[in-house]
UniProtKB/Swiss-Prot annotation:
Similarity-based family: Belongs to the glycosyl hydrolase 1 family.
Gene Ontology cellular component terms for the protein in this record: chloroplast
InterPro entries xrefs: Glyco_hydro_1, Glyco_hydro_1_N_CS, Glycoside_hydrolase_SF
pH dependence of this protein's activity: Optimum pH is 5.0-5.5.
Keywords for this protein: Chloroplast, Disulfide bond, Glycosidase, Hydrolase, Plastid, Transit peptide
Subunit field text: Heterodimer. The N-terminus of the larger subunit is blocked and the smaller subunit might be derived from the larger one.
Any GO molecular function: beta-glucosidase activity
PROSITE patterns referenced in this protein's UniProt entry, alphabetically: GLYCOSYL_HYDROL_F1_2
Residues reported to bind a beta-D-glucoside: 110, 214, 259-260, 401, 472, 518, 525-526, 534
Protein name as annotated: Furostanol glycoside 26-O-beta-glucosidase
Catalysed reactions listed for this entry: protodioscin + H2O = 26-deglucoprotodioscin + D-glucose
Disulfide bonds: 279-285
Amino acid sequence: MAAQLGLPLVSCHRGASQAASSSAHLVPGASAIMQAGNRRQKMRAPALRDRVVFARVVPVDGSVGFAGSSTEQETAVESATPTAVPSKVVLGRSSFPRGFIFGAASAAYQVEGAWNEGGRGPSIWDTFTHDHPEKIADHSNGDKATDSYKKYKEDVKLLKDLGLDSYRFSISWSRILPKGTLQGGINQEGIQYYNDLINELLKNGIRPMVTLFHWDVPQALEDSYKGFRSSEIVNDFKDYADICFKEFGDRVKHWITLNEPWSLSTMGYAFGRHAPGRCSTWYGCPAGDSANEPYEVTHNLLLAHANAVKIYRDNYKATQNGEIGITLNSLWYEPYSKSHEDVEAATRALDFMFGWYMDPLVNGDYPFIMRALVRDRLPFFTHAESELIKGSYDFIGINYYTSNYAQHAPVTEDHTPDNSYFDSYVNQSGEKNGVPIGPLQGSWIYFYPRGLKELLLYVKRRYCNPKIYITENGTAEVEKEKGVPLHDPERKEYLTYHLAQVLQAIREGVRVKGHFTWALTDNFEWDKGYTERFGLIYIDYDKDFNRQPKDSTKWFSKFLRT
């Protein structure tokens, strides 16, 4: 499809320059975009969590879940989507390949709390939420979060009781290196905390999947040299990663370098909704450059990732017998219409969100269409950097929540770029003619299970079928004013149908090896604060962070034992 759309195909076996040159003749679409004479339309900024899909799912008997007998204790799924699994599919753990990993996920700033305890230094999220509470929906912060720093044993017990295989969590960089650098000193209390967590997991039969960086840059590095806007951070991240591999790698066999670099670069530097809260002044930030900084930050993120992978492969992989990858997020995009322009726009949107990171990892350079449209604002890799980045993963983590429609936006060659988000010339929307692409869950997730399967198949076709873990997938309830929202049928439905799509993708040859539900517990949801709840486990923030299983946990536990 990519060649028909006038976009370059990615090769897993050729160098970046060769792939780019061989595909240049395939870009009539890019040329047409560059020469279009219409004025550029105003494009919609991303929705608040920026994952925005189209399928009505029809439960077989009006409910999705478990009945009484052992043969019925599996999830029956019927789908009205043309590419979904066959009309009735019975699902349980045994439906998936042997060794498939089921897990749940979290992130340090979202759950740990203890922001100024145990020797931890501040991160940019501490500064952002303290200095700009108006940027958070309920003016809250992660100072206490879910108190997992002190209640980690309770969380491990919940994982075990559910029957999950793995726990994906992140390490707080500033809890290990309070000043962000090796020279600033290693915090042994932080080392001990993560050792205790890892050991508790293993004692209970739960394997850790550890993310090194989930957006919480040490504030000291932001103050010293502007954080990920500077290439200086690459060596400091490499030192931090080296410490983690050395201290924890004898027990951690699954490493993720970065979580959702797109979210940091776009939400943190194009719109200022996330830390460090930078964007151009006309988007409401005191300082920033929405047209350039996201590209600079992404460039340094990719170099930091590649250098950390090299350290692991050179010094640890052979003896520790682990694997290392990166987690990328993406929506799936359906063309707004059947027109060639909208079909091409859907692929272009994928290039600007997913390909922005995946193309360098596979091919050593950014997508050709980005080079054509962004031009000199898109940084270049040296030959050595390109070779370092290319192939720097054992697996790819994919975070999927929802999908959007993609509509071609008319382009002018002489426009003045003001935001990287609009450089794709794609209007994105969760609705078409006032009709949502799928039922709305929470405030921003349109229920579209088919999008997950289509994204997985796209990655298989375009990027040489890498090993994949679904590292985040889940839905939310908006916080209720009264009562305890333990009744969460939408989560049960969401997970049922998305797992069915994962299974179908596996049957079609995609190398998916695991699925991690977001999230184990309710938590601090970034700019949403505590107004939305993604957890399998309810957190009572008013009563000592009491943990209570929601209704979906009963279903999920049975699913995992079937």
